[in-house]
Amino acid sequence: MDKTTQVNQKTGLLSQPKAVWAVAFACVISFMGIGLVDPILPAIAAQLHASPSEVSLLFTSYLLVTGFMMFFSGAISSRIGAKWTLILGLIFIIVFAGLGGSSSSIAQLVGYRGGWGLGNALFISTALAVIVGVSVGGSAQAIILYEAALGLGISVGPLAGGELGSISWRAPFFGVSVLMFIALIAISFMLPKLPKPAKRVGVFDAMKALKYKGLLTMAVSAFLYNFGFFILLAYSPFVLDLDEHGLGYVFFGWGLLLAITSVFTAPLVHKALGTVRSLVVLFIAFAAILVIMGIWTDHQTLIITCIVVAGAVLGMVNTIMTTAVMGSAPVERSIASSAYSSVRFIGGALAPWIAGMLSEHFTASTPYTVGGIVVFVGMLVLLMGRKHLAGIKAGH
C-alpha cells in the first residue's frame, strides 16, 4: 500500500464531495422512515381502533414492497439513470408520507406505507451505488458512510417520531414529507448527472444473482437475521408500556449505539475475526438477547437495557454483512446489493405481523423467543455456507 492510498483511507470518510453528503442526508431521512412509527404505534392502535397485529402491518406493507421492488430497482436505474431514480424515489416518499398523515383508517395508512416503501426501494438501493460511485476513499469507506447514515436515520427516526407524535400521530408523517422535499432539492442541485451504465441491467438480473451460493448464503442469513431485527423494533413498543416520548428516547439510544458500532467497531471486529466468525459470534449474541427478553418480558428496565445493547450488536452485523455481500458473487455490486437487500427486507416484512399474531394467540414473550430461535437458525445457515464465503476479505 502506497502513501497516497493510506492518506485517502484516513481522510476519505469525511472528505467527501457535496454530492455524497446530499445523498447521505437523504439516506438519513429515508431510514428515519423505518423507526419513525415506532413510538406512535400504540397511539395509532388506540386512535384508529386497530389491534397490534393490524398496526404491525405498517411495517409489513412498507418492507414487503421495499423488498420486492429492490429486485427491479437496478434495472430501472440503468434505464433512467441513477440521479433520476433517486429523484423518483424521493417523490414517491414525499407523496405517500404526506398521504399517510392524512389517513382516516388503518387500511388507508397501511396502503400508503406500501407506496412509501416503493419510493424507499428506488432510493435506498440506488443511493448505496451512488455513494460508492462518487465518494473518495474506496468502497469500504463508502459502505461505512452509508451504514452510518442508516444508523443515524434509524436512531433519529424514533426520537423525531416521539417528539412529533406527542403532538399528533400524524405529525411524523408530515415531517418526513417536508424533510424529503428538502433532500429532493439538495440532490437535484448538488448531485451531477451520472452516466448510465454501458450495459443495461436485466429485469431479472438481481434474482438470477441468487444462484451464486455465496450471495444466497448471505441473503438467507440476512432474511432470518432481519426477522429478529424487526421483532425487536416493531413489537417492543407494545411491551414497554411507555408514552411517545419514552419510546422515542429508548429507540434513540438503540439507534445511536447502532450508528456508532457500524462506523467504528464493525471494521475492527471484521478485520480481527473475518466475515463468518464475526457474524457467527454476533448472531449468537443477538439471539441470546432476544431469548433473554423472552424470559423476562415483564421486567421493563431489563427490556430497555436489552434493546439498547442490541443496537451495538446490530450495527456491527449490518456493516459486516453489507461489506461482505459486495464480494460474495461475480456480479456488479449494485446487482448483488439489490438481490441481498430484497431478501433481507422481505424477512423484515414478515416479522412484525407474525409477532403481533404470536402475542395475541400465545403470550407476550413468545415473539422474542421465536425471534431468538430464527436468528440462531440464521447463524447455522452461515456456518453451513461458510465454504462459499471463504474468498470474502474483511473490508472488501
Curated annotation (Swiss-Prot):
Query: Which Gene3D superfamilies is this protein grouped with?
Result: MFS general substrate transporter like domains (1.20.1250.20)
In which domain of life is the source organism classified? Bacteria
Keywords attached to this Swiss-Prot or TrEMBL record, sorted alphabetically, are:
Cell membrane, Copper, Copper transport, Ion transport, Membrane, Transmembrane, Transmembrane helix, Transport
Q: Which InterPro entries match?
A: Copper_Efflux_MFS (IPR053200), MFS (IPR011701), MFS_dom (IPR020846), MFS_trans_sf (IPR036259), Tet-R_TetA/multi-R_MdtG-like (IPR001958)
What disulfide bonds does the UniProt entry report for this chain? none
Can you say where in the cell this protein is located? Cell membrane
Q: Which GO terms describe its molecular function?
A: transmembrane transporter activity
Q: How is this protein induced?
A: Repressed by YfmP.
Do you know which PROSITE patterns this protein is assigned to? MFS
GO CC terms in record: plasma membrane
Keyword Cell membrane found = yes
**What membrane topology does the UniProt entry give?**
Multi-pass membrane protein
Q: Look up the record and give one Gene Ontology term from the biological process aspect.
A: copper ion transport
Transmembrane annotation, as ranges: 20-40, 56-76, 80-100, 114-134, 142-162, 171-191, 214-234, 249-269, 278-298, 301-321, 339-359, 364-384
Instruction: Quote the record's miscellaneous comment.
Output: Cotranscribed with yfmP.
Family from the record: Belongs to the major facilitator superfamily.
Function (record text)? Acts to efflux copper or a copper complex. It is possible that YfmO could contribute to copper resistance.
Query: What is the name listed in the Swiss-Prot or TrEMBL entry for this protein?
Result: Multidrug efflux protein YfmO
In the UniProt record, what gene is named as encoding this protein? yfmO
